[in-house]
Amino acid sequence: MSDSKEPRLQQLGLLEEEQLRGLGFRQTRGYKSLAGCLGHGPLVLQLLSFTLLAGLLVQVSKVPSSISQEESRQDVIYQNLTQLKAAVGELSEKSKLQEIYQELTQLKAAVGELPEKSKQQEIYQELTRLKAAVGELPEKSKMQEIYQELTRLKAAVGELPEKSKMQEIYQELTRLKAAVGELPEKSKQQEIYQELTRLKAAVGELPEKSKQQEIYQELTQLKAAVGELPEKSKQQEIYQELTRLKAAVGELPEKSKQQEIYQELTQLKAAVERLCRRCPWEWTFFQGNCYFMSNSQRNWHDSITACKEVGAQLVVIKSAEEQNFLQLQSSRSNRFTWMGLSDLNEEGTWQWVDGSPLLPSFNQYWNRGEPNNVGEEDCAEFSGNGWNDDKCNLAKFWICKKSAASCSRDEEQFLSPAPATPNPPPA
């Protein structure tokens, strides 16, 4: 009985295993089910390990990609710094300044993403070199200081005597030398010339500008008188005055000596006044006539009256040489100056104050487009480098003209004082 039961139990065990295989290792109750599940544990562990390893490989594969991106970004930063260095080397051009600004903008964006300390150090070195290069440019304060120095220099140069005035003084002394050069003794001529040279140097050191101008006027008047010296006795008298002047000039440093020089010049003026003068003081001699250039302004009719009061007339131009002389005097002072020409009697017919008509050859002296009679312009003036017509009631400077005096060679004539001629009264 027992023998028949054992084969039957074996058959039941085999049947149970087949059922388990058909169900895919499905858990069932009983001891056999638990043993089957425990038998497949290593396979589950291997599956979990494979999943974890795959995740790690995916993460590792991402690291080289980010590193390569960082390296490429560092290369871009280095290239930008190289371009910036080259741009600083050519800093003088405005386009390069703009390029540097762009490079700095890019540098700012790149520095914000710097990952490695070594790149930061390299950028710091480049910035240090850039600072050194920029440091060689002139500082704004230095530029301002240079500008201030130039301003002071301009102001100092502005206080120097005008070149034209210096040239004029030199020309006056040259003419005076030529006049004195006609003295009989050659040795005396040389001595006088040397004295005038010393006098010129001494006058250049006088501190007071007003005193210099006064001495310049005295020398101008002396030139006018000496230029027409006919008598040996008068030449000797002037030579004596220059000798006295020499003694004063020789000790110029003291202020008292400067005053002494001024007194000597005053005495010299008094001596010259005893000579024959073709023109009064403050009048200018030219080709046998004397001319007075006013320092005040009047209208055209009052200018005629002012000239008549001193025995002259508002200037009438008779030659091209006279026109050139008067035009130069007017343009040099940059003044609008009346002349004795108008078309008051008949519009378009120009006449001088002495009644003579304007010659056709003189029409060339009108400025372009003149006379145009805009607003009843009937009187002529010196304007710029030519003539212009303007309203007669306007106040302007004026020029008087009269014939120069004739000098006799009689000694008594030279010893007698020249008649005093008043200047036109101020307006």
UniProtKB/Swiss-Prot annotation:
Domain C-type lectin: start-end pairs: 286-401
Primary role: Pathogen-recognition receptor expressed on the surface of immature dendritic cells (DCs) and involved in initiation of primary immune response. Thought to mediate the endocytosis of pathogens which are subsequently degraded in lysosomal compartments. The receptor returns to the cell membrane surface and the pathogen-derived antigens are presented to resting T-cells via MHC class II proteins to initiate the adaptive immune response. Probably recognizes in a calcium-dependent manner high mannose N-linked oligosaccharides in a variety of pathogen antigens.
Domain commentary: The tandem repeat domain, also called neck domain, mediates oligomerization.
Designated name of the protein: CD209 antigen
Membrane topology listed for this record: Single-pass type II membrane protein
Gene name of this polypeptide: CD209
GO cellular component labels: external side of plasma membrane
Keywords: Adaptive immunity, Calcium, Cell adhesion, Disulfide bond, Endocytosis, Glycoprotein, Immunity, Innate immunity, Lectin, Mannose-binding, Membrane, Metal-binding, Receptor, Repeat, Signal-anchor, Transmembrane, Transmembrane helix
Primary location recorded for the protein, binned into one broad class: membrane
GO BP annotation list: adaptive immune response; cell adhesion; endocytosis; immune response; innate immune response
High-level lineage: Eukaryota, Metazoa, Chordata, Craniata, Vertebrata
Topology feature Cytoplasmic, residues: 1-37
